[in-house]
UniProtKB/Swiss-Prot annotation:
InterPro entries: K+_transporter, K_trans_C, K_trans_N, Kup
Cleaved signal peptide residues: none
HAMAP family named in the record: Kup
Subcellular location: Cell inner membrane
Family note: Belongs to the HAK/KUP transporter (TC 2.A.72) family.
Biological role: Transport of potassium into the cell. Likely operates as a K(+):H(+) symporter.
Keywords carried by this UniProt record: Cell inner membrane, Cell membrane, Ion transport, Membrane, Potassium, Potassium transport, Symport, Transmembrane, Transmembrane helix, Transport
Listed name of the protein: Probable potassium transport system protein Kup
Membrane topology: Multi-pass membrane protein
């Protein structure tokens, strides 16, 4: 790791006190996993899995939950995966870029790893729909215990909360976001307090910390053992957020928050619920809320609703960040990205993603109507992403970090075995409602691979009739056209060929500018490119220059601002002397060798509706000329 990477990964954010960073991390990172106690044990003992609410059943499940939290979250994510940062950034797309770099010498392996990364990203979007739906539903369902006759109001109230959450996204959460940390700290303290109160009634429940109870559960219930992991995994939902949000807080604050507050609070609450079930098996209908005294029920519902809204906000923000990374890595069409904070570059809003998630969440709430029904569909996307993360990290450990196989392989096999068991336990959920996130993931995977392949084919088609730059410049020397004052910047994907916009301009206008710049924007497999590596400049003579701008997948691609770094006497990028020439291609599906006709038509539709270079690269509107061309694919 480089210095910048190490600082980010370690959480050395200048000007921010460690305690403040820890509280902020609790508010953003741990909302999802922190609201899991609302529905995990409720689902386990719902009757769907055949687990008896007795001494052995409660102890076995508690042992499985505790050791799953220890192995998957504490060991796998906190101790290992948080070290796999891409210059301080985490998440499935950052990890895919890292794995792509690690496997550069193995083209076939590289292709497989990229495909797996895209599948993981696609599943994340499916999870981004289920998390808000199940979290808010489970919180509002507490009203059923407080007031009789409110059962029919749960779904409408949940929809009101969720729709309001999506409506405020455009305005940003900069102001109220400062409350997320304190609210979630209060939530975890309440979780721990409720758990301690329950444990004091039946302290023998702490015996379930012994892993023997989990092993015994598998031995006594061999058929049920693997299947029950499909419910136990609900306690792990949100574990991927530890890695995805690492770029915001760094590794150390996330790890400290987990061990100092989050893990103890979760364990205490789960064991408190277990103690309640030992005393009153009928409490299995909603052990979380029934753990609280009657007078605290309404305040607890309010706090739980706030916590689930914060958890949902974190998932939605994660979807925005993932989309921006995927756009700049070339897997998703360009969309309008709106910044919602003048202070924080990472706080963004993408309308297309926001409204798509909202529609998906509304359909889930209307279709399943309860957190229990949704729990039967939850887990496929989560465990699939966790398994893919382990595979990608394995490639990074062995190929990039060069860990000795004798040390790395046993650890990786342990991760893959546990992740594989959780995933296998959740596969049957596909036929119990879990098809929704899977289908959403399949659709997104098709869109991403179609866009990526379509862009590659488009560049190849444009190259077929292209003119090599040296030949073109030689012809300019022989027959020099009329030159006009100023600088013309032509954006092109291939820096060694003449852009079509340049040929069209010369053909129709019979003039060239004094300085002609062929500009290529390249995105690296790293989050940020330092200013001293931002550009490359080559002079070809006759006033022609090739400029290559380098950006990371979290950088803001502001082309006019970046061109100011090109300090050359011959080049003048002053705003009133610079004109940008863009090409807009219209794709026509044909019988040429490439993609299937339906994928070509899909790509043409996406290209037509994608955000243009003008807005994406922040070009001045009054200094842009756009020329169109048709391309058969």
């Amino acid at each position: 790791m480089g210095q910048a990477s190490s600082q980010a990964a370690s959480g050395e954010h200048s000007g921010v006190k460690p305690l403040g960073m820890l509280v902020a991390a609790v508010g953003v990172v741990y909302g999802d996993i922190g609201t899991s106690p609302l529905y995990t044990l409720k689902e386990v003992f719902s009757g769907s899995y055949g687990v008896q609410v007795n001494h052995d059943g409660v102890f076995g499940i508690l042992a499985l939950i505790f050791w799953s939290l220890v192995w998957v979250v504490s060991i796998k994510y906190v101790l290992f995966i948080l070290r796999a940062d891409n210059q301080g950034e985490g998440g499935i797309m950052a990890l895919t870029a890292l794995a792509r770099r690690a496997s550069a010498s193995y083209p076939r392996l590289r292709s497989v790893l990229v495909i797996l990364g895209l599948i993981g990203a696609s599943l994340f979007y499916g999870d981004s729909m289920i998390t808000p739906a199940i979290s808010v539903l489970s919180a509002v369902e507490g009203l059923e215990l407080a007031f009789s006759g409110l059962e029919h109001w749960v779904v409408p109230l949940a929809l009101v909360v969720l729709v309001a959450l999506f409506l405020i996204q455009k305005h940003g959460t900069d102001r109220i976001g400062k409350l997320f940390g304190p609210v979630m700290v209060a939530w975890f303290l309440v979780l721990g307090g409720l758990g301690i109160n329950g444990i004091l009634q039946h302290p023998e429940v702490l015996q379930a910390l012994n892993p023997v109870w989990g092993v015994r559960f598998f031995i006594v219930h061999p058929g049920m053992g693997v299947a029950i992991l499909g419910a136990v995994v609900l306690a792990l939902t949100g574990a991927e957020a530890l890695y995805a949000d690492m770029g915001h807080f760094g590794r150390k604050p996330i790890a400290r928050a987990w061990f100092a507050l989050v893990l103890p609070a979760l364990v205490l609450n789960y064991f408190g619920q277990g103690a309640l079930l030992l005393e009153n098996p009928e409490a299995a209908r909603n052990p979380f809320y029934l753990l609280a005294p009657g007078w605290a029920l309404i305040p607890l519902v309010v706090l739980a609703t706030l916590a689930t809204v914060i958890a949902s906000q974190a998932v939605i923000s994660g979807a925005f960040s993932l989309t921006r990374q995927a756009i700049q890595l070339g897997y998703i069409p360009r969309m309008h990205i709106q910044h919602t904070s003048s202070a924080e570059q990472g706080q963004i809003y993408i309308g297309a993603v926001n409204w798509s998630l909202m529609v998906g969440v509304i359909l889930l709430v209307l279709g399943f109507e309860s957190s229990g029904a949704l729990a039967s569909a939850y887990g496929v996307a989560v465990t699939g992403t966790m398994l893919i993360t382990s595979i990608l990290v394995a490639a990074v450990m062995l190929l990039l970090w060069k860990w000795p196989p004798v040390l790395a392989v046993p650890v990786l096999l342990g991760f893959l075995l546990v992740d594989g068991l959780f995933f296998a336990a959740n596969v049957p959920k596909i036929f119990q409602g879990g098809a929704f996130p899977v289908l959403a993931g399949i659709v997104l995977f098709i869109l991403m691979t179609t866009w990526k392949r379509g862009k590659e084919l488009l560049v190849d088609r444009l190259d077929e009739g292209g003119l090599p730059l040296p030949i073109f410049i030689s012809s300019i020397r022989v027959q020099p056209p009329h030159r006009v004052q100023g600088t013309a910047v032509f954006l092109t994907a291939r820096p060694d060929a003449v852009p079509h916009a340049l040929l069209h301009n010369l053909l129709h206008n019979q003039v060239l500018h004094e300085q002609v710049v062929l500009l290529t924007v390249v995105y690296e497999d790293i989050p940020r490119v330092p200013a001293n590596r931002r550009f490359e400049v080559d002079s070809y003579g006759e006033g022609f220059f090739r400029v290559i701008l380098h950006f990371g997948f979290t950088d803001e691609p502001d082309v006019p601002e970046a061109l100011k770094l090109c300090h050359l006497d011959e080049l003048d990028f002053s705003p009133m002397r610079t004109t940008y020439f863009l090409s807009r291609e219209t794709v026509i599906a044909s019988k040429l060798v490439g993609m299937a006709r339906w994928r070509e038509a899909l790509f043409a539709f996406m290209l037509k509706n994608a955000n243009g270079n003008l807005r994406f690269f922040k070009l001045p509107v009054n200094r842009v000329i756009e020329l169109g061309t048709q391309v058969e694919m």
